[in-house]
A protein has these predicted regions:
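A bilobed periplasmic-binding-protein/Venus flytrap-type ligand-binding module shared by bacterial periplasmic
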Residues: 92-97, 134-138, 213-227, 243, ...
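Extracytoplasmic ligand-binding site segments that recognize negatively charged/polar headgroups
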Residues: 1-4, 38-178
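A ligand-binding cleft/hinge motif common to bilobed small-molecule-binding domains
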Residues: 49-52, 178, 183-201
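Mature extracytoplasmic/periplasmic domains
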Residues: 219-282
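Paired acidic/hydrophobic, glycine-rich loop segments that form the ligand-binding mouth/hinge
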Residues: 40-44, 166, 183-188, 203
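Conserved C-terminal helix/tail region of periplasmic/extracytoplasmic solute-binding proteins
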Residues: 275-304
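Early extracytoplasmic/lumenal segment of secretory-pathway proteins
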Residues: 1-53
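Periplasmic-binding protein-like
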Residues: 87, 150-159, 196-222, 256-258, ...
Length: 304
């Protein structure tokens, strides 16, 4: 979707060619910058990696003289990064198993394997899972942060034996649902809409989802900082933002994009008012401080 709605139109308009290198990997970014051999000029990272990258001195500060932030939501603007799109991690389910309305609607129900039996998949990462574990343990949405990590791990201990696959790429949970290998999943909302378009019998539940965003960052030592800055300035404007959202229902980071977004796409976005109010907004600062320790703990926990 990015290639069609952003990269190609930007190339056509400016003559600046964008060469994609995938996937984004924080470890690789760190190694590049620290070795002085920076191959990437611009990187699409999760919101937490902006905080981590700034802390690790891996990023160039953005030039906000050249980037017009009019209409951009304040929480996605950072000295070292700016939002690309909003997305949600949600509870997804097989509509073959669950007719509309009788699927789990909370993480407590996802955890309830007696009432909702069946194979499950969750992300192989503490991100998202710890929030969902607290919600499953009846922590109110507005009290999730700062997280009670011990309580979260006690809660996730209970679901661990019932998770058939710990997914590592965004495409995986949607594919597992489409193939009928699992009946319940945590997934990024756009991936579920994509398989629905292809006819897969899958649905998603916005309630207790986790709302977050991706960001553009420029690695320290980028060889084409000017080109990267031009792309960021272009891509955060209303029309490019609307173009990507009309293609796949993520949320624009620029409020002015709503003028150019179709009614159906607007309803399906994670930031649609009815959807956003039922979700937890990520706290990147909290994760930026605790992430490394929790990833180590998670990896050890998974092996137990």
């Amino acid at each position: 979707a990015q290639r069609k709605t952003m990269f190609q139109p930007f190339e056509k308009e400016t003559g600046i060619k964008i060469v994609e290198a995938s996937p984004t990997d924080y470890g690789k970014l760190k190694a590049m910058v620290q070795s002085g051999n920076v191959e990437w000029d611009l990187v699409d990272v999760g919101d937490l990696n902006v905080v981590a990258g700034a802390k690790d001195n891996l990023l160039e500060p953005l030039d906000y003289q050249a980037i017009d932030t009019k209409g951009v939501f304040p929480q996605v603007i950072h000295k070292y990064g700016i939002g690309t799109i909003y997305y949600s991690t949600v509870l997804a389910y097989s509509t073959k198993k669950y007719a509309k309305g009788d699927h789990p609607k909370t993480w407590a129900q996802f955890w309830d394997v007696g009432k909702f039996p069946g194979p499950r998949t969750m992300r192989n990462n503490p991100l998202d899972n710890l929030e969902f574990a607290l919600l499953a343990d009846d922590v109110p949405m507005d009290k999730v942060y700062p997280m009670d990590v011990e309580r979260a791990f006690r809660s996730i201990d209970r679901i661990k034996p019932h998770v058939n696959v710990w997914w590592t790429t965004g495409a995986q949970p949607a594919q597992l649902l489409a193939d009928g290998e699992v009946e319940l999943a945590t997934s990024w909302n756009g991936r579920i809409f994509a398989i629905q378009k292809q006819g897969a019998r899958a649905g998603l539940e916005w309630n207790q989802g986790k709302l977050q965003w991706d960001s553009w960052v420029i690695p320290r030592g980028s060889k084409n900082k000017d080109g990267a800055t031009k792309f960021i300035a272009w891509s955060t404007q209303p029309k490019p933002q609307a173009a990507i959202v009309n293609e796949i229902p993520y949320g624009p980071v620029n409020q002015r994009a709503f003028e150019f977004i179709g009614a159906q796409a607007a309803r399906d976005m994670p930031t649609a008012p009815d959807n956003a109010k039922r979700q937890v907004m990520v706290d990147p600062a909290w994760w930026g401080e605790h992430r490394n320790v929790l990833v180590e703990r998670w990896n050890a926990w998974l092996l137990k």
